[in-house]
Amino acid sequence: VRKLFSVTLLAASMLASVTAAQEAPKADAASLEELKAQIKVMQEQLKSLEAKTAAPAAKPAAAPVPATQIKWEGSPRFTDASGATFKLRGRVLIDGVNVDVNRDTGPSYKSRQYRARQVFLGAEGQFGAFAYRIEGGAANGGAWGWDDAVIEYKTKSGLLLTVGNQKVGGLENLTSIKAITFMERGPFGDLTDNGFVLAAQATKVGKNWSLRGALQGDSINKADVSSGAYIANNAKERSGFMVRGTYAPIMTADDAVHLGVSARYRDTGGETGFTYSAAANTAYKPQTSTGGVLLSTGAVGKSDTSIAAEAAWKHKTVSVQGELAQIKVNRVATTQSAANGGKDFNIVTGYALASWFPTGESRPYNAAGQFGKVKILNPIDKGGMGAFELAGRYDYADLTKMSPNAVTALASQPGLATAGTYKGLTAGVNWYPYSNVRFMANVTKAKVNNRRIGTIENDADVTVFQARMQIEF
Protein backbone atom coordinates (compact mmCIF):
# COMPACT_ATOMS: atom_id res chain seq x y z
CA VAL A 1 0.00 0.00 0.00
CA ARG A 2 2.83 2.38 0.84
CA LYS A 3 4.43 1.64 -2.52
CA LEU A 4 1.13 2.34 -4.29
CA PHE A 5 0.81 5.66 -2.46
CA SER A 6 4.33 6.67 -3.50
CA VAL A 7 3.72 5.85 -7.15
CA THR A 8 0.42 7.72 -7.13
CA LEU A 9 2.05 10.80 -5.62
CA LEU A 10 4.85 10.68 -8.19
CA ALA A 11 2.36 10.36 -11.04
CA ALA A 12 0.37 13.33 -9.81
CA SER A 13 3.53 15.40 -9.58
CA MET A 14 4.50 14.52 -13.15
CA LEU A 15 1.01 15.38 -14.43
CA ALA A 16 1.37 18.78 -12.84
CA SER A 17 4.71 19.18 -14.58
CA VAL A 18 3.11 18.34 -17.94
CA THR A 19 0.43 20.95 -17.44
CA ALA A 20 3.04 23.52 -16.59
CA ALA A 21 5.09 22.52 -19.60
CA GLN A 22 2.10 22.89 -21.94
CA GLU A 23 1.49 26.43 -20.71
CA ALA A 24 5.18 27.33 -21.10
CA PRO A 25 6.60 28.36 -24.45
CA LYS A 26 7.15 25.32 -26.60
CA ALA A 27 10.88 25.63 -26.43
CA ASP A 28 11.83 22.05 -25.92
CA ALA A 29 9.49 19.59 -27.71
CA ALA A 30 11.86 16.67 -27.18
CA SER A 31 11.81 17.07 -23.41
CA LEU A 32 8.02 17.13 -23.43
CA GLU A 33 7.74 13.88 -25.38
CA GLU A 34 10.19 12.19 -23.06
CA LEU A 35 8.13 13.28 -20.07
CA LYS A 36 4.94 11.88 -21.62
CA ALA A 37 6.65 8.53 -22.16
CA GLN A 38 7.66 8.38 -18.52
CA ILE A 39 4.09 9.16 -17.45
CA LYS A 40 2.77 6.31 -19.60
CA VAL A 41 5.16 3.88 -17.93
CA MET A 42 4.09 5.12 -14.51
CA GLN A 43 0.40 4.65 -15.39
CA GLU A 44 1.03 1.01 -16.37
CA GLN A 45 2.83 0.40 -13.08
CA LEU A 46 -0.06 2.05 -11.20
CA LYS A 47 -2.62 -0.27 -12.86
CA SER A 48 -0.48 -3.31 -12.03
CA LEU A 49 -0.21 -2.34 -8.36
CA GLU A 50 -3.96 -1.70 -8.13
CA ALA A 51 -4.68 -5.19 -9.48
CA LYS A 52 -2.31 -6.80 -6.98
CA THR A 53 -3.90 -4.86 -4.09
CA ALA A 54 -7.41 -5.95 -5.07
CA ALA A 55 -6.48 -9.68 -5.23
CA PRO A 56 -7.23 -11.62 -1.97
CA ALA A 57 -4.29 -12.73 0.12
CA ALA A 58 -3.39 -16.42 -0.30
CA LYS A 59 -4.41 -18.70 2.61
CA PRO A 60 -1.57 -20.12 4.66
CA ALA A 61 -0.76 -23.75 3.90
CA ALA A 62 -2.44 -26.30 6.20
CA ALA A 63 -0.24 -27.91 8.82
CA PRO A 64 0.79 -31.43 7.77
CA VAL A 65 -1.12 -34.29 9.44
CA PRO A 66 1.19 -36.18 11.81
CA ALA A 67 2.16 -39.63 10.57
CA THR A 68 0.95 -41.21 13.86
CA GLN A 69 -2.03 -39.95 15.87
CA ILE A 70 -2.41 -40.54 19.61
CA LYS A 71 -5.74 -40.78 21.45
CA TRP A 72 -6.04 -41.26 25.19
CA GLU A 73 -8.30 -44.21 26.14
CA GLY A 74 -7.10 -45.03 29.64
CA SER A 75 -3.73 -45.56 27.95
CA PRO A 76 -2.54 -44.12 24.62
CA ARG A 77 -3.91 -45.65 21.43
CA PHE A 78 -1.56 -45.09 18.49
CA THR A 79 -2.96 -44.92 14.93
CA ASP A 80 -0.66 -44.57 11.91
CA ALA A 81 -1.43 -43.16 8.47
CA SER A 82 -2.60 -46.57 7.20
CA GLY A 83 -5.15 -46.93 10.01
CA ALA A 84 -3.21 -49.57 11.96
CA THR A 85 -3.60 -49.23 15.75
CA PHE A 86 -1.75 -50.29 18.90
CA LYS A 87 -2.74 -49.91 22.55
CA LEU A 88 -1.35 -51.23 25.81
CA ARG A 89 -3.82 -52.68 28.32
CA GLY A 90 -3.63 -54.16 31.78
CA ARG A 91 -5.18 -54.51 35.22
CA VAL A 92 -4.22 -54.94 38.86
CA LEU A 93 -6.67 -56.51 41.34
CA ILE A 94 -5.56 -56.67 44.99
CA ASP A 95 -7.77 -58.63 47.42
CA GLY A 96 -8.11 -59.24 51.11
CA VAL A 97 -10.11 -62.41 51.93
CA ASN A 98 -11.34 -63.79 55.26
CA VAL A 99 -13.01 -67.25 55.27
CA ASP A 100 -14.80 -68.79 58.25
CA VAL A 101 -16.05 -72.41 57.87
CA ASN A 102 -18.09 -74.14 60.58
CA ARG A 103 -18.71 -77.85 59.99
CA ASP A 104 -21.11 -80.29 61.65
CA THR A 105 -18.54 -83.08 61.57
CA GLY A 106 -14.93 -82.77 60.58
CA PRO A 107 -12.68 -79.81 61.32
CA SER A 108 -13.90 -76.22 61.21
CA TYR A 109 -11.37 -73.60 60.26
CA LYS A 110 -10.62 -69.94 59.68
CA SER A 111 -8.36 -68.51 57.01
CA ARG A 112 -7.20 -65.05 55.95
CA GLN A 113 -5.15 -64.00 52.94
CA TYR A 114 -3.99 -60.76 51.27
CA ARG A 115 -3.33 -61.53 47.65
CA ALA A 116 -2.97 -60.36 44.09
CA ARG A 117 -6.11 -61.70 42.45
CA GLN A 118 -4.76 -60.63 39.05
CA VAL A 119 -1.76 -58.67 37.78
CA PHE A 120 -2.13 -58.63 34.01
CA LEU A 121 -0.50 -56.78 31.12
CA GLY A 122 -1.28 -56.95 27.43
CA ALA A 123 -1.84 -55.19 24.14
CA GLU A 124 -4.41 -54.89 21.38
CA GLY A 125 -4.36 -53.54 17.86
CA GLN A 126 -5.64 -53.73 14.32
CA PHE A 127 -4.28 -54.07 10.79
CA GLY A 128 -7.07 -53.48 8.30
CA ALA A 129 -9.69 -56.23 8.74
CA PHE A 130 -7.42 -58.15 11.15
CA ALA A 131 -7.19 -57.44 14.88
CA TYR A 132 -5.40 -58.99 17.83
CA ARG A 133 -5.72 -58.99 21.60
CA ILE A 134 -3.27 -60.57 24.02
CA GLU A 135 -3.20 -60.33 27.79
CA GLY A 136 -1.59 -62.39 30.51
CA GLY A 137 -0.09 -62.30 33.95
CA ALA A 138 -0.18 -63.89 37.38
CA ALA A 139 -3.48 -64.86 39.02
CA ASN A 140 -4.07 -65.96 42.60
CA GLY A 141 -0.36 -66.02 43.39
CA GLY A 142 0.36 -68.54 40.64
CA ALA A 143 2.72 -68.62 37.69
CA TRP A 144 2.32 -66.48 34.56
CA GLY A 145 -0.56 -67.53 32.33
CA TRP A 146 -2.58 -66.18 29.41
CA ASP A 147 -6.20 -65.09 29.32
CA ASP A 148 -6.94 -63.42 25.99
CA ALA A 149 -4.66 -64.44 23.14
CA VAL A 150 -6.70 -64.08 19.95
CA ILE A 151 -6.57 -63.05 16.30
CA GLU A 152 -9.77 -61.67 14.80
CA TYR A 153 -10.94 -61.13 11.23
CA LYS A 154 -14.11 -59.22 10.35
CA THR A 155 -15.70 -59.86 6.96
CA LYS A 156 -17.45 -57.21 4.89
CA SER A 157 -20.79 -58.71 5.94
CA GLY A 158 -19.91 -58.14 9.63
CA LEU A 159 -19.14 -61.75 10.56
CA LEU A 160 -16.40 -61.83 13.20
CA LEU A 161 -14.01 -64.81 13.11
CA THR A 162 -11.91 -65.29 16.26
CA VAL A 163 -9.13 -67.84 16.76
CA GLY A 164 -7.17 -68.27 19.99
CA ASN A 165 -7.60 -68.43 23.76
CA GLN A 166 -11.01 -66.93 24.51
CA LYS A 167 -13.99 -67.08 26.83
CA VAL A 168 -16.48 -69.91 26.58
CA GLY A 169 -19.78 -68.00 26.60
CA GLY A 170 -22.66 -66.97 28.85
CA LEU A 171 -23.93 -63.61 30.10
CA GLU A 172 -21.89 -63.25 33.27
CA ASN A 173 -18.81 -64.98 31.88
CA LEU A 174 -18.58 -62.72 28.81
CA THR A 175 -18.74 -59.69 31.10
CA SER A 176 -15.13 -58.90 32.02
CA ILE A 177 -13.94 -59.44 35.59
CA LYS A 178 -13.21 -55.71 35.44
CA ALA A 179 -16.95 -54.99 35.08
CA ILE A 180 -18.85 -57.81 36.83
CA THR A 181 -20.96 -56.65 39.75
CA PHE A 182 -19.39 -58.93 42.37
CA MET A 183 -15.80 -59.90 43.02
CA GLU A 184 -16.35 -63.43 41.68
CA ARG A 185 -18.95 -65.19 39.52
CA GLY A 186 -19.86 -67.69 42.24
CA PRO A 187 -20.70 -71.41 41.98
CA PHE A 188 -22.43 -70.99 38.61
CA GLY A 189 -19.17 -69.94 36.99
CA ASP A 190 -17.21 -72.64 38.82
CA LEU A 191 -19.49 -75.54 37.88
CA THR A 192 -20.02 -74.55 34.25
CA ASP A 193 -16.23 -74.18 33.90
CA ASN A 194 -16.51 -70.87 32.07
CA GLY A 195 -12.81 -70.13 31.75
CA PHE A 196 -10.64 -69.43 28.71
CA VAL A 197 -10.10 -72.15 26.10
CA LEU A 198 -8.45 -72.37 22.69
CA ALA A 199 -11.26 -72.08 20.16
CA ALA A 200 -12.25 -71.10 16.63
CA GLN A 201 -15.35 -68.97 16.91
CA ALA A 202 -17.75 -67.17 14.54
CA THR A 203 -19.91 -64.30 15.85
CA LYS A 204 -22.63 -62.29 14.15
CA VAL A 205 -24.17 -59.28 15.90
CA GLY A 206 -27.32 -57.59 14.63
CA LYS A 207 -29.22 -54.52 15.72
CA ASN A 208 -30.53 -56.21 18.87
CA TRP A 209 -29.43 -59.83 18.59
CA SER A 210 -26.33 -61.99 18.46
CA LEU A 211 -25.37 -65.52 17.47
CA ARG A 212 -22.07 -67.26 18.06
CA GLY A 213 -20.69 -70.74 17.64
CA ALA A 214 -17.29 -72.22 18.45
CA LEU A 215 -15.17 -75.35 18.22
CA GLN A 216 -13.27 -75.58 21.51
CA GLY A 217 -10.27 -77.29 23.01
CA ASP A 218 -8.47 -76.75 26.31
CA SER A 219 -6.70 -73.73 27.79
CA ILE A 220 -3.59 -72.37 26.07
CA ASN A 221 -1.85 -72.59 29.45
CA LYS A 222 -2.20 -76.36 29.66
CA ALA A 223 0.65 -78.59 28.53
CA ASP A 224 0.16 -81.00 25.64
CA VAL A 225 -1.37 -84.35 26.56
CA SER A 226 1.50 -86.83 26.45
CA SER A 227 -0.47 -89.93 27.45
CA GLY A 228 -4.01 -90.92 28.29
CA ALA A 229 -5.31 -90.99 31.84
CA TYR A 230 -6.96 -94.40 31.50
CA ILE A 231 -5.44 -95.71 28.24
CA ALA A 232 -1.79 -94.73 27.83
CA ASN A 233 -1.88 -94.63 24.02
CA ASN A 234 -5.01 -92.44 23.93
CA ALA A 235 -3.26 -89.06 24.23
CA LYS A 236 -6.19 -86.94 23.09
CA GLU A 237 -6.88 -83.49 24.48
CA ARG A 238 -10.40 -82.56 25.47
CA SER A 239 -12.59 -80.97 22.79
CA GLY A 240 -16.12 -79.73 22.23
CA PHE A 241 -18.36 -77.07 20.76
CA MET A 242 -20.63 -74.25 21.94
CA VAL A 243 -23.49 -72.15 20.53
CA ARG A 244 -25.16 -69.07 22.06
CA GLY A 245 -27.97 -66.85 20.86
CA THR A 246 -29.31 -63.63 22.40
CA TYR A 247 -32.20 -61.28 21.66
CA ALA A 248 -33.09 -57.92 23.20
CA PRO A 249 -36.74 -56.94 22.51
CA ILE A 250 -36.04 -53.66 24.31
CA MET A 251 -32.65 -51.94 24.00
CA THR A 252 -32.24 -48.23 24.67
CA ALA A 253 -29.80 -46.17 26.72
CA ASP A 254 -32.13 -46.34 29.75
CA ASP A 255 -33.92 -49.66 29.26
CA ALA A 256 -33.02 -53.16 28.15
CA VAL A 257 -34.53 -56.63 28.20
CA HIS A 258 -32.12 -59.48 27.44
CA LEU A 259 -32.98 -63.09 26.63
CA GLY A 260 -30.44 -65.75 25.79
CA VAL A 261 -29.84 -69.49 25.46
CA SER A 262 -26.67 -71.50 25.06
CA ALA A 263 -25.57 -75.10 24.66
CA ARG A 264 -22.16 -76.70 25.10
CA TYR A 265 -20.75 -80.18 24.65
CA ARG A 266 -17.35 -81.38 25.93
CA ASP A 267 -15.45 -84.65 25.79
CA THR A 268 -12.32 -85.38 27.83
CA GLY A 269 -10.62 -87.28 25.00
CA GLY A 270 -7.95 -89.29 26.76
CA GLU A 271 -7.64 -86.97 29.78
CA THR A 272 -8.75 -87.42 33.38
CA GLY A 273 -12.49 -86.92 33.95
CA PHE A 274 -14.06 -83.49 34.43
CA THR A 275 -14.40 -82.32 38.05
CA TYR A 276 -17.43 -80.27 39.09
CA SER A 277 -16.62 -78.16 42.16
CA ALA A 278 -17.47 -74.74 43.56
CA ALA A 279 -16.44 -72.24 46.23
CA ALA A 280 -18.39 -69.58 48.10
CA ASN A 281 -17.92 -66.53 45.86
CA THR A 282 -14.15 -66.50 46.14
CA ALA A 283 -11.21 -67.52 44.00
CA TYR A 284 -9.32 -68.17 47.24
CA LYS A 285 -9.92 -71.86 48.03
CA PRO A 286 -8.38 -72.75 51.39
CA GLN A 287 -10.59 -75.86 51.36
CA THR A 288 -7.95 -77.61 49.25
CA SER A 289 -5.35 -77.35 52.01
CA THR A 290 -7.34 -77.30 55.24
CA GLY A 291 -10.49 -79.17 56.17
CA GLY A 292 -11.12 -80.84 52.83
CA VAL A 293 -13.23 -79.84 49.84
CA LEU A 294 -16.68 -78.39 50.56
CA LEU A 295 -18.56 -79.01 47.28
CA SER A 296 -17.18 -81.30 44.55
CA THR A 297 -17.96 -84.48 42.63
CA GLY A 298 -14.38 -85.50 42.02
CA ALA A 299 -13.12 -86.35 38.51
CA VAL A 300 -16.26 -88.19 37.38
CA GLY A 301 -17.14 -86.70 33.96
CA LYS A 302 -16.18 -88.49 30.73
CA SER A 303 -18.21 -85.95 28.76
CA ASP A 304 -20.99 -83.46 29.48
CA THR A 305 -23.71 -81.42 27.81
CA SER A 306 -24.75 -78.06 29.28
CA ILE A 307 -27.96 -76.20 28.44
CA ALA A 308 -28.34 -72.70 29.89
CA ALA A 309 -30.92 -69.92 29.84
CA GLU A 310 -30.19 -66.23 30.50
CA ALA A 311 -32.35 -63.20 31.24
CA ALA A 312 -31.68 -59.61 32.26
CA TRP A 313 -33.63 -56.39 32.69
CA LYS A 314 -32.47 -52.87 33.35
CA HIS A 315 -34.18 -49.54 33.82
CA LYS A 316 -31.87 -46.56 34.29
CA THR A 317 -30.05 -47.16 37.60
CA VAL A 318 -31.55 -50.58 38.39
CA SER A 319 -30.70 -53.92 36.78
CA VAL A 320 -31.59 -57.56 37.39
CA GLN A 321 -30.07 -60.63 35.76
CA GLY A 322 -29.94 -64.38 36.16
CA GLU A 323 -28.80 -67.63 34.56
CA LEU A 324 -29.86 -71.24 35.02
CA ALA A 325 -27.97 -74.27 33.69
CA GLN A 326 -28.39 -78.02 33.62
CA ILE A 327 -25.26 -80.10 33.10
CA LYS A 328 -25.81 -83.69 31.96
CA VAL A 329 -22.74 -85.62 33.11
CA ASN A 330 -21.74 -88.80 31.30
CA ARG A 331 -19.58 -90.52 33.90
CA VAL A 332 -16.41 -92.43 33.36
CA ALA A 333 -16.80 -96.20 33.34
CA THR A 334 -16.24 -98.13 36.55
CA THR A 335 -13.78 -100.29 34.61
CA GLN A 336 -11.66 -97.16 34.12
CA SER A 337 -12.08 -95.77 37.65
CA ALA A 338 -13.84 -97.61 40.45
CA ALA A 339 -13.61 -94.50 42.64
CA ASN A 340 -15.22 -92.12 40.11
CA GLY A 341 -17.26 -94.32 37.78
CA GLY A 342 -21.01 -94.82 37.93
CA LYS A 343 -24.35 -93.85 36.43
CA ASP A 344 -24.85 -90.63 34.47
CA PHE A 345 -26.50 -87.77 36.36
CA ASN A 346 -27.55 -84.11 36.10
CA ILE A 347 -26.23 -81.02 37.89
CA VAL A 348 -28.41 -77.91 38.24
CA THR A 349 -26.96 -74.50 39.08
CA GLY A 350 -28.06 -70.89 38.79
CA TYR A 351 -28.03 -67.40 40.26
CA ALA A 352 -30.06 -64.20 40.35
CA LEU A 353 -28.65 -60.75 41.09
CA ALA A 354 -29.86 -57.18 41.41
CA SER A 355 -27.86 -53.94 41.19
CA TRP A 356 -28.69 -50.29 41.94
CA PHE A 357 -26.67 -47.09 41.43
CA PRO A 358 -27.95 -44.41 43.86
CA THR A 359 -25.62 -41.92 42.14
CA GLY A 360 -27.47 -42.21 38.81
CA GLU A 361 -25.23 -44.46 36.69
CA SER A 362 -26.51 -47.30 34.51
CA ARG A 363 -24.95 -50.60 33.43
CA PRO A 364 -24.38 -50.32 29.64
CA TYR A 365 -25.81 -53.17 27.56
CA ASN A 366 -24.96 -53.93 23.93
CA ALA A 367 -26.41 -56.00 21.09
CA ALA A 368 -23.76 -58.71 21.57
CA GLY A 369 -25.63 -59.72 24.72
CA GLN A 370 -23.11 -58.31 27.18
CA PHE A 371 -22.87 -55.69 29.91
CA GLY A 372 -19.91 -53.30 29.73
CA LYS A 373 -17.95 -50.88 31.87
CA VAL A 374 -19.93 -48.26 33.75
CA LYS A 375 -19.44 -44.61 32.77
CA ILE A 376 -19.06 -42.46 35.89
CA LEU A 377 -21.21 -39.32 35.80
CA ASN A 378 -19.34 -37.32 38.46
CA PRO A 379 -15.75 -38.56 38.91
CA ILE A 380 -13.79 -37.12 41.79
CA ASP A 381 -11.38 -35.23 39.52
CA LYS A 382 -14.40 -33.21 38.31
CA GLY A 383 -15.43 -32.31 41.84
CA GLY A 384 -17.90 -35.20 42.19
CA MET A 385 -18.07 -38.14 44.56
CA GLY A 386 -17.73 -40.89 41.97
CA ALA A 387 -20.33 -43.65 41.68
CA PHE A 388 -21.74 -46.05 44.26
CA GLU A 389 -23.33 -49.41 43.48
CA LEU A 390 -25.31 -51.62 45.85
CA ALA A 391 -25.99 -55.23 44.89
CA GLY A 392 -27.24 -58.60 46.08
CA ARG A 393 -27.07 -62.12 44.65
CA TYR A 394 -28.54 -65.54 45.39
CA ASP A 395 -26.60 -68.67 44.29
CA TYR A 396 -27.80 -72.25 44.05
CA ALA A 397 -26.22 -75.56 43.05
CA ASP A 398 -27.40 -79.16 43.30
CA LEU A 399 -24.96 -82.06 42.80
CA THR A 400 -26.97 -84.64 44.75
CA LYS A 401 -28.11 -86.63 41.71
CA MET A 402 -24.69 -88.28 41.60
CA SER A 403 -25.25 -91.82 42.88
CA PRO A 404 -22.83 -94.43 44.26
CA ASN A 405 -21.67 -97.40 42.25
CA ALA A 406 -21.71 -101.02 43.39
CA VAL A 407 -18.10 -101.77 42.43
CA THR A 408 -16.36 -100.39 45.52
CA ALA A 409 -17.19 -99.27 49.06
CA LEU A 410 -18.85 -95.88 49.64
CA ALA A 411 -15.81 -94.67 51.57
CA SER A 412 -13.69 -95.36 48.47
CA GLN A 413 -15.85 -93.05 46.34
CA PRO A 414 -14.61 -89.67 47.65
CA GLY A 415 -16.88 -87.47 45.54
CA LEU A 416 -20.04 -88.80 47.18
CA ALA A 417 -19.29 -87.08 50.49
CA THR A 418 -19.13 -83.62 48.90
CA ALA A 419 -21.65 -83.91 46.05
CA GLY A 420 -24.31 -81.93 47.89
CA THR A 421 -26.25 -78.68 47.59
CA TYR A 422 -25.13 -75.07 47.89
CA LYS A 423 -27.29 -72.09 48.79
CA GLY A 424 -25.72 -68.68 49.31
CA LEU A 425 -26.44 -64.97 49.61
CA THR A 426 -23.90 -62.28 48.73
CA ALA A 427 -24.18 -58.55 49.41
CA GLY A 428 -21.82 -56.08 47.77
CA VAL A 429 -21.00 -52.40 47.64
CA ASN A 430 -18.78 -50.86 44.97
CA TRP A 431 -17.28 -47.37 44.74
CA TYR A 432 -15.98 -46.03 41.44
CA PRO A 433 -13.97 -42.80 41.90
CA TYR A 434 -13.14 -42.97 38.18
CA SER A 435 -14.31 -45.23 35.37
CA ASN A 436 -11.10 -47.28 35.52
CA VAL A 437 -10.73 -47.47 39.32
CA ARG A 438 -12.98 -49.48 41.61
CA PHE A 439 -13.14 -50.42 45.29
CA MET A 440 -15.28 -53.47 46.16
CA ALA A 441 -16.53 -55.14 49.34
CA ASN A 442 -18.48 -58.43 49.44
CA VAL A 443 -19.90 -60.55 52.24
CA THR A 444 -21.20 -64.06 51.53
CA LYS A 445 -23.21 -66.37 53.78
CA ALA A 446 -23.57 -69.88 52.38
CA LYS A 447 -24.84 -73.28 53.45
CA VAL A 448 -23.46 -76.54 52.05
CA ASN A 449 -25.48 -79.71 52.72
CA ASN A 450 -23.80 -83.02 51.93
CA ARG A 451 -24.93 -86.64 52.36
CA ARG A 452 -23.78 -88.74 55.26
CA ILE A 453 -21.16 -91.36 54.43
CA GLY A 454 -20.74 -93.61 57.46
CA THR A 455 -20.16 -91.32 60.42
CA ILE A 456 -19.12 -88.31 58.32
CA GLU A 457 -21.45 -85.62 57.05
CA ASN A 458 -19.56 -82.71 55.50
CA ASP A 459 -22.19 -80.00 55.97
CA ALA A 460 -20.73 -76.52 56.37
CA ASP A 461 -21.77 -72.96 57.12
CA VAL A 462 -19.47 -70.59 55.25
CA THR A 463 -18.92 -66.87 55.80
CA VAL A 464 -16.64 -64.94 53.47
CA PHE A 465 -15.61 -61.28 53.88
CA GLN A 466 -13.50 -59.86 51.10
CA ALA A 467 -12.45 -56.51 49.65
CA ARG A 468 -10.69 -55.43 46.48
CA MET A 469 -8.88 -52.44 45.01
CA GLN A 470 -8.87 -52.52 41.22
CA ILE A 471 -7.30 -50.38 38.51
CA GLU A 472 -7.36 -51.11 34.79
CA PHE A 473 -6.32 -49.41 31.59
Predicted regions and their residues:
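Structural signature of transmembrane alpha-helix termini at the membrane-water interface
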Residues: L15-V18, P249, K447, F473
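Short, solvent-exposed secondary-structure boundary motifs
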Residues: A67-Q69, R112, V300-G301, T444
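Outer-membrane beta-barrel pore domains
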Residues: K26, G273-F473
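Hydrophobic alpha-helical membrane context
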Residues: M14-L15, F130, G454
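A general secondary-structure boundary signal
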Residues: S31-M42, T53-A54, F120-E124, D148-V150, ...
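Gram-negative bacterial Sec-dependent N-terminal signal peptides
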Residues: V1-Q22
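Outer membrane beta-barrel
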Residues: Q69, E73-G269, N346-K382, A387-N405
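N-terminal periplasmic/intermembrane-space "pro-region" immediately following the signal or transit peptide
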Residues: A20-L93, D100, S362-I376, T408, ...
